Amino acid sequence: MKVIIVKDNVEGGKEGYKLFADAKKNGATTFGLATGSTPITTYQEIIKSDLDFTDSISINLDEYVGLPEDSDQSYDYFMHENLFNAKPFKHSYLPNGRAADLEAEAKHYDQIIEDNPIDLQILGIGRNGHIGFNEPGTPADSTTHKVSLTQSTIDANARFFEHEEDVPRYAISMGLASIMKSKHILIEAYGEDKADAIKGMIEGPVTTDLPASVLQNHDNVTVIIDEAAASKLSNK
């Protein structure tokens, strides 16, 4: 893993943007995207730039199950607000969390990934080491699947909802094996509350107890973290 330690998430966003710009320059056509607060500064830098994605495809990591189509908490809404409205893609794929048959939707999504290999995948990491909605215990060979969210993830996402009971209990997420197919993986993390997860991901054993640790088995991972998230690393 290549580790880049930055002052804060603003500087991290600039570093993340550089990877998107380099990927585009080198012919990348398919980008794996993530939601949440972590990638926002990278998306802001992309929006300010002259990068054009109208010839590119985006594939998002995950989506909540069961939210109304017009919900402003859906990841589809998030992506339009934070990137797509300003930088449209030729085609943008997100899992359909309202599908009547979620198992069939998961297989369909895996086929999309198979047909459009991801050149650059951006990730955040949860405090418990989850990537996408792949919670601790998720097998390394997992493909797109329905996920029961852990209480810690529900608690972390509750700030985006009016009431804690409004937070969905299920999501549909690319699996760890799906993510590992990406040619280049960028993972960003900011803040001291991510320090334990980052240490485990980089320096700990590869274990299903910390899903992000599987990234040690990928040969092209860039980690962008601030000093607080890097604070528990032995080698900096």
UniProtKB/Swiss-Prot annotation:
Q: Which top-level group of life is the source organism from? A: Bacteria
- Keyword Transmembrane helix listed? The answer is no
Which InterPro entries does this entry report, sorted A to Z? Glc/Gal-6P_isomerase, Glucosamine6P_isomerase, Glucosamine6P_isomerase_CS, NagB/RpiA_transferase-like
Give me the reactions it catalyses.
Answer: alpha-D-glucosamine 6-phosphate + H2O = beta-D-fructose 6-phosphate + NH4(+)
Catalytic residue positions: 62, 128, 130, 135
State a GO cellular component annotated for this protein. cytoplasm
GO BP term (any one): N-acetylneuraminate catabolic process
Pathway noted in the entry: Amino-sugar metabolism; N-acetylneuraminate degradation; D-fructose 6-phosphate from N-acetylneuraminate: step 5/5
Keyword terms: Carbohydrate metabolism, Hydrolase
What are its E.C. numbers? 3.5.99.6
Gene Ontology MF term list: glucosamine-6-phosphate deaminase activity; identical protein binding
Stated family: Belongs to the glucosamine/galactosamine-6-phosphate isomerase family. NagB subfamily.
What is the documented function of this protein? Catalyzes the reversible isomerization-deamination of glucosamine 6-phosphate (GlcN6P) to form fructose 6-phosphate (Fru6P) and ammonium ion.
Record-linked PANTHER family: GLUCOSAMINE-6-PHOSPHATE ISOMERASE
Q: What is this protein called?
A: Glucosamine-6-phosphate deaminase
Gene name, per UniProt, is: nagB
